[in-house]
Amino acid sequence: LLYEQILRLFPKNRDSIKSLITSLVKQGRIIHDKENDLLCDTAESASNPDYGMIAAFWVLLDFKKAVVYHTNGDFPIKLNFFSKDEWYEILYIPLEQEYLINHVMESQSADQVKRLVVLENEGQARKVTIDNVVAFCLVDTTSGVVSYYTKK
């Protein structure tokens, strides 16, 4: 994740979180790639960041005040979170992977879940046939600004 994402997760404790991050880096428990401003668990993840997870986490941060619990998901779901009585999945669809993700999601139960789908560009939405999509998301991964829209 990006350093700024972790700080935004704990906005009232920014200084404490910065100290904790510094301590974890000194202990070798996490890696801070200062050039890309990434916090990673391994050198391998620092050299090959999961930009889909970074984008999905920006979406999660938009819902932060309402989130009761969150966890990672299984491919192609990046994150799951619960808000009140609602269950959400955040998916990330890279360019040219729309049909693959559609196929994988056909076997996934969609009875009670609401899906937020992060795309690389707006044109991908017309190729997505996943059930229970409540919004498509475009994420500026640098600023964290998320734009939400629905398919017409």
Segments predicted by a language model, with ranges:
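Short acidic, hydrophobic short linear motifs in intrinsically disordered regions
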Residues: 1-10
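Nucleic-acid-binding surface
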Residues: 1-2, 29-105
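Short phosphate-engaging motifs
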Residues: 2, 16, 124
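Short amphipathic alpha-helical interaction segments
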Residues: 11-26
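A short acidic, amphipathic alpha-helical/loop segment
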Residues: 20, 100-107, 128-129
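Hydrophobic beta-strand segments of well-ordered beta-sheets in folded domains
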Residues: 85-92, 110-120, 134-136
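Domain-level recognition of nuclease-like catalytic cores that cleave nucleotide substrates
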Residues: 123-152
